A protein has these predicted regions:
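Residue(s) in the substrate-gating loop at a strand-loop-helix junction
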Residues: 143
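Conserved glycine-rich cofactor-binding loop
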Residues: 7, 14-16
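Active-site helix of classical SDR
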Residues: 118, 159, 167
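Alpha-helical segment proximal to the catalytic Tyr-Lys
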Residues: 123, 172-176, 238
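Substrate-binding pocket helix/loop in short-chain dehydrogenase/reductase
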Residues: 93-95, 102-107, 210
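C-terminal helical subdomain
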Residues: 183, 204-236, 240, 247-249
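Short C-terminal tail/terminal secondary-structure segment
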Residues: 92, 230, 241-267
């Protein structure tokens, strides 16, 4: 098993990618601290069983981040992996309809949250790596919107672009520690955050249009993103550092076009 006896924290573990990742880490032998601002995190931990602990936490609160890491240290004797996944969308308002309070809150959770995770988890992961002679990993959840925002939310897109840059900066500043820092960049994924989009498409008989701009022509499932996070956290990615891995069905590989523009049709 890839994470046998490893100590892992997953934030945003109450639903979506975080829940799928927490379950996947445990299935691979990890002891997991499941953290989320909602009570749903208790269900995730219960699903996993004795290998999991649950804690309510606000990803953008330094006090809560410190408290969550302390739980992992107390329960599991150290920390090997931090998956800083918690985030919020902030809606789809354009620049002119986005007020300072909204963008501040999105940045607090989506960007300051990963910053705090790195700041407080990295020293513990480095300490564990030195003790074991191995390495540790921090994985952040960014977004394809942080690579190429298109017409998306300015608050969300800016926050996720910041996460990508933060992963790169942290990888450099943790030089020599054997702690790797990478980010996953999901495309449209069926989670609690995007549930209204998928539900509307199903009700309207238009589910085939979800994700139509990417070459796979579908949205992702949380388990697919979880597997990407596990890869980056695992020894299989031992030489992958400071990278932003797009897991978006190919959306970011090109500017959005349709075959009709070139006089061709889909195969």
């Amino acid at each position: 098993m890839r994470f046998e006896n490893k100590s892992v924290i997953v934030t945003g573990a109450g639903s979506g990618i975080g829940r799928a990742a927490a379950i996947a880490f445990a299935r691979e032998g990890a002891r997991v601290v499941c953290a989320d601002i909602t009570a749903a995190v208790e269900d995730t931990a219960a699903t996993i069983g004795t290998a999991a602990r649950a804690i309510r936490m606000d990803a953008g609160s330094e006090e809560d981040v410190v408290r969550t890491i302390a739980l992992a240290l107390d329960a599991h004797g150290g920390l090997d992996v931090m998956f800083a996944n918690a985030g919020i969308s902030g809606g789809m308002a354009n620049i002119f309809d986005t007020d300072v309070a909204l963008i501040t809150e999105v940045l607090r959770v989506n960007l300051i949250g990963p910053f705090l995770a790195i700041k407080h988890a990295a020293p513990e992961i480095a300490r564990r790596a030195k003790e074991t002679g191995g390495g540790g990993a921090i994985v952040l959840t960014a977004s394809v919107a942080g690579i190429r925002s298109g017409a998306g939310s300015p608050a969300y897109s800016a926050s996720k672009a910041g996460v990508i840059n933060l992963a790169q900066v942290a990888a450099q500043q943790l030089s020599g520690s054997n702690v790797r820092v990478n980010a996953i960049c999901p495309g449209l994924t069926e989670t609690g955050m995007t549930k209204p989009v998928f539900d509307y498409a199903r009700d309207a008989g238009k589910i085939d249009r979800v994700g139509r701009l990417n070459p796979l022509r579908r949205g992702a499932q949380p388990e697919e993103l979880a597997e990407a996070a596990l890869f980056l956290a695992s020894d299989a990615a031992s030489y992958v550092n400071g990278q932003a891995l797009a897991v978006d069905g190919g959306l970011s590989s090109s500017h959005p076009v349709t075959r009709q523009e070139y006089g061709t049709t889909a195969a």
